[in-house]
């Protein structure tokens, strides 16, 4: 298989010389700041849409409907296509932008893509903070989406290529950790800006998105590019020097040879999109489609960017709903550290399976709690004790996602693709992630209105399906060098029919023409 490496017939993977260096740690820390812009937007959008001053200015019909329905159906009071378009337009823009980002990443490197994403996101943040009408608001959201699309396409690849194999999981998950930090920061900012007299706090919330954008863009100016990217652009001497620097040793011959072989195979590919559709890459194609799709079908982004609206819907006051969102943001961030500490020791499959089971139970219990209190009529006065139980249940769900499908939904796809299809395949990951984020964001409030408490059962059923998918179809990838990843498919009971059983034994490096 193109981009493969020599592996022993017993399937033991190579252990390249090298160590974790301060240089790699700092580079990955700076690159992972790309997650801040994504996380900040997830957290900020739901908060401002629960602020009365924001609704009065841009969505007066939603505000009027909210006030009219205090004693009626709580499920439907925020159902507005225009309001959901404000939230979801970003993800549609990110979807389209990621396709263009693939070309930029391949031709100019991961660093340039991250820099461009940060600058475009910065412009969008300024427009949103200064918005005078809905059109200006949506245009700003679209620019934010382009920035997110560029960032999400390049950052996971950068982290996976810079990290040594035995620590790839931990370093790659720093991207998801930064997403959770962004969400928490946004929730805290919303809580305090909602208290600003004069009704302009939402401008501060939206405008402060410029801060993570500046961090990402500024940091990208000082980042080195990865050896993989340098080789694919014909910079052999720079690539070898960079590999020595990031591994902290001069003994990089075996790893460098494998990278060169992968690069030669990559250069032989004229159209990586067409190559991705070839039968031998069927496992990677399926994973690049289903993992991001299933990640969004957990319902996590519904909880995170609609958390204040959701809490308000089930009876919390405005300030209480924002504080509840802060609590879930804290849980989200701290639970991510569990994944960082265990992913390279326990492996990807165990975390995904255990997290899936926990999410299933949490969703069904949450649906039952809301069903008992609100029924199908959506009318109830929720007590403080009952509200606490609901928040605890949501926290159980969020924590499960944060140490499983949250970080691993980005990690696993970024580490399984050979170099010749890596940029294109990562764009597919981002496209499907953003597509289903857009779809769910656009229809969530309508689904809540029509399915009522059944919406949580729907997401629970999706989590049952995805847990089964991991159990049967996802092989373990921990500790395997990124350019040797092809061998796991040849040893898998199902995928070996596409790549050939020989891929699990000794694999000769070949190029595709």
From Swiss-Prot:
Family indicated by similarity: Belongs to the major facilitator superfamily. Sugar transporter (TC 2.A.1.1) family.
Organism name: Oryza sativa subsp. japonica
Protein name: Sugar transport protein MST8
Entry membrane topology: Multi-pass membrane protein
Keywords of this entry: Membrane, Sugar transport, Symport, Transmembrane, Transmembrane helix, Transport
Main location: membrane
Tissue specificity: Expressed specifically in anthers.
The keyword Membrane is assigned to this record: yes
């Amino acid at each position: 298989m193109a981009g493969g490496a020599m592996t022993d017939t017993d399937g033991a993977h190579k252990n390249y010389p090298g160590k974790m260096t301060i240089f790699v740690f700092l580079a990955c820390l700076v690159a992972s700041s790309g997650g801040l812009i994504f996380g900040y937007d997830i957290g900020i959008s739901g908060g401002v849409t629960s602020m009365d001053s924001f609704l009065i200015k841009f969505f007066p019909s939603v505000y009027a409907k909210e006030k009219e329905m205090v004693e009626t159906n709580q499920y439907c009071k925020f159902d507005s296509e225009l309001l959901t378009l404000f939230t979801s337009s970003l993800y549609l823009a990110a979807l389209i932008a990621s396709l263009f980002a693939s070309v930029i990443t391949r031709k100019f490197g991961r660093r340039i893509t991250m820099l461009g994403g940060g600058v475009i996101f910065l412009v969008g943040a300024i427009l949103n903070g200064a918005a005078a009408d809905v059109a200006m608001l949506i245009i700003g959201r679209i620019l934010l989406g382009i920035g997110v699309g560029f960032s999400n396409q390049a950052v996971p690849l950068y982290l996976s290529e810079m990290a040594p194999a035995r620590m790839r999981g931990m370093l790659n998950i720093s991207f998801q950790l930064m997403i959770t930090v962004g969400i928490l920061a946004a929730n805290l900012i919303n809580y305090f800006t909602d208290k600003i007299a004069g009704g302009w706090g939402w401008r501060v919330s939206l405008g402060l998105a410029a801060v993570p954008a500046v961090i990402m863009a500024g940091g990208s100016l000082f980042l080195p590019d990865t050896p993989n990217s340098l080789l694919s652009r014909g910079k052999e001497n720079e690539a070898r020097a960079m590999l020595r620097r990031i591994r902290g040793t001069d003994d990089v011959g075996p790893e460098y040879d494998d990278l060169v072989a992968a690069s030669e195979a990559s250069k032989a590919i004229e159209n990586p999109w067409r190559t991705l559709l070839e039968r031998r890459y069927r496992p990677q194609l399926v994973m690049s489609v289903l993992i991001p799709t299933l990640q969004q079908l957990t319902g996590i982004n519904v909880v995170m960017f609609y958390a204040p609206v959701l809490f308000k819907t089930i009876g919390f006051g405005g300030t209480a709903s924002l504080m509840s969102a802060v609590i879930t943001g804290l849980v989200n961030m701290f639970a991510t550290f569990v994944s960082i500490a265990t992913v390279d020791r326990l492996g990807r499959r165990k975390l995904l399976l255990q997290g899936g089971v926990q999410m299933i139970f949490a969703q069904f219990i949450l649906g039952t709690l809301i069903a008992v209190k609100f029924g199908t009529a959506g009318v109830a006065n929720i007590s403080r004790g009952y509200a606490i139980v609901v928040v605890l249940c949501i926290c159980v769900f969020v924590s499960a996602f944060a140490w499983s499908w949250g970080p691993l939904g980005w990690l696993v796809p970024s580490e399984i693709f050979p170099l010749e299809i890596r940029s294109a395949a990562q764009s597919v990951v981002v496209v499907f992630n953003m597509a289903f984020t857009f779809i769910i964001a656009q229809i969530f409030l309508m689904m809540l209105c029509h399915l009522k408490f059944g919406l949580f059962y729907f997401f629970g059923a999706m989590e049952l399906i995805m847990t089964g998918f991991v159990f049967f179809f996802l092989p373990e990838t921990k500790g395997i060098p990124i350019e040797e990843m092809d061998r796991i498919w040849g040893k898998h009971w199902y995928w070996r029919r596409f790549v050939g059983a020989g891929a699990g034994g000794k694999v000769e490096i070949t190029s595709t023409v």
